[in-house]
């Protein structure tokens, strides 16, 4: 007995493209008061479902294959999971870095106890936007002893200098501060950058004040990084929204231009039809004139024929003859 045919293998869909992910994040930023948990208190389920269907419609407008609503929700869940995992790594590494600085670990900054350099965890701009939507701590990068990794990515000439408290016995030894060093401080929300300084030598005469100042410079609050990253994310979001509006305006103008061209073509067609009508009227008038000229002689001949066939009136009788006839009759 033959076995039943195996069901056809389900064709695997393509991964979400960057444009699809960007549309999902943009729509969630636009409708965060409907779809994000810590914003949508009291929002009815019908409004949430309508917002998700709008997102699905926009994704399918640019997707190469048809997407279903569970796929879009699953993609958003995966994006949130990835961002939260990176944020957890950042926090854990920062706590570990703080303990190593306070405890004066044997390893150098930016290195694990085994001697291997820890790779920084960097959030992409898209992940930073998702992080802002989720309400997580806004962190550009994880420095294992180097908090300026994200800034160095943006500007290689800017470097963040970190200092630790040195032992009293070691503070007497001169230590040079390398040139091309970046300082940034939080004073009333103002970030100051000072680059390409000359090397500074810390001597034993005034080590305590210098090291205390350097420690204050190095121990920057998380609020500064959060504020910088949040401002960057907002600017990027506004720029993308502006670009989207510009594209929509351009599409609207193109549609208007197409409509005007159609109107012009219809007017040209109407003008051609009117011109053909005028030419036809002129031809008809010419034909009627020729017909009238042909019929005139025929009408004249017909009149003559009628006149020739009509009997002439009788001649008037003589009055004498008329009187004789009257007498005979009497």
Swiss-Prot record:
Skewed-composition ranges (Gly residues): 95-108
One of the GO biological process terms: spermatogenesis
Entry GO terms, CC: central element; mitochondrion; nucleus
A Pfam family that the UniProt record links to this protein: Myb_DNA-bind_5
Main location class: nucleus
Compartments reported by the entry: Nucleus
Region (Disordered): 92-117, 147-175, 309-330
Chain residue ranges for the region called Required for nuclear localization and apoptosis-inducing activity: 1-74
InterPro entries: Myb_DNA-bind_5 (IPR028002)
Keyword terms, alphabetized: Apoptosis, Nucleus
PANTHER family for the chain: PROTEIN SIX6OS1
Family, as annotated: Belongs to the NAIF1 family.
Function: Induces apoptosis.
Name of the molecule in the record: Nuclear apoptosis-inducing factor 1
Organism from which the protein derives: Gallus gallus (Chicken)
Taxonomic classification: Eukaryota, Metazoa, Chordata, Craniata, Vertebrata
Gene name as annotated: NAIF1
